[in-house]
Amino acid sequence: MKVSVLITLAVLGVMFVWASAAELEERGSDQRDSPAWLKSMERIFRSEERECRKMFGGCSVDSDCCAHLGCKPTLKYCAWDGTFGK
């Protein structure tokens, strides 16, 4: 029973990908298809300068992270540094 459910889900997934690819090929993947507000949001996020990185944000040094967060050296992300207070 489990195998038949997995096979059915796999077939449905393949059919979805195939149908999406056919529709994309038919319409084309031109940038004019994307809404104008999406392009403006992309511009805003690219140009916005952030003060500090929040939890799990990428970093290179401790000063990149917000208060009470430190940059983990192995995976380079901001995580709680174990401190409390204001």
Swiss-Prot record:
It comes from the Eukaryota. Keywords: Amidation, Disulfide bond, Ion channel impairing toxin, Knottin, Potassium channel impairing toxin, Secreted, Signal, Toxin, Voltage-gated potassium channel impairing toxin, Voltage-gated sodium channel impairing toxin. GO terms for cellular component: extracellular region. The keyword Isomerase does not apply. Its main location: secreted. Residues 22-50 form a propeptide. The keyword Acetylation does not apply. This toxin acts as a voltage-dependent gating-modifier. It inhibits the sodium conductance (IC(50)=124 nM) and slows the fast inactivation (EC(50)=1180 nM) of Nav1.5/SCN5A. It significantly shifts the activation to more depolarized voltages and decreases the deactivation of Nav1.5 currents upon extreme depolarization, but only slightly affects voltage-dependence of steady-state inactivation. In addition, this toxin causes an approximately five-fold decrease in the rate of recovery from inactivation and an approximately 1.9-fold reduction in the closed-state inactivation rate. This is Kappa-theraphotoxin-Cg1a 3. It comes from Chilobrachys guangxiensis (Chinese earth tiger tarantula).
